[in-house]
A protein has these predicted regions:
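N-terminal loops that bind phosphate or other acidic moieties
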Residues: 1-129
Length: 129
């Protein structure tokens, strides 16, 4: 992996930490991901946590739910930080794709990760319709 973009996994309770731990178990510790939880904070505190995680670097924020507080906070943050892109509906496949393509610019990395994430969602098993 390479130096490059920061990925911020922004999620409810311990979900962000679990995603980052899973990526580390699969891809190693040089992943560029930071876990941020919304637990116990209001919107201002969540924005402060996000700002500390991004630390003025080019970044992609991966939020858990498209319509949740994490996604709303990330979208508001990105509107005032042009070097930040937001992807919602985070899954492990998109995070793994991101960590191996941190050399891209935020827009390209976000688009690639979102496409990988969408493509990884399948229905397996059961009777054919």
């Amino acid at each position: 992996m390479s130096e490059g973009l920061t990925g911020v996994v922004l999620a409810h309770t311990e979900v962000a930490e679990a995603f980052v731990a899973a990526v580390e178990a699969i891809a190693g510790s040089d992943h560029g991901l930071v876990a941020v939880s919304n637990e116990g904070c209001d919107r201002a505190a969540l924005t402060a946590r996000l700002d500390a995680a991004v630390a003025a670097r080019p970044a992609v924020v991966f939020a858990d739910l498209p319509g949740g507080s994490c996604a709303f906070s990330a979208a508001a943050y990105a509107r005032t930080h042009p070097h930040v892109r937001v992807v919602t509906g985070v899954n492990l496949a998109m995070l793994l794709d991101f960590v191996f393509h941190r050399d891209l610019d935020p827009a390209a990395a976000a688009a690639r990760a979102a496409e990988t994430g969408r493509g990884s969602v399948t229905v397996v098993g059961g009777a054919a319709a």
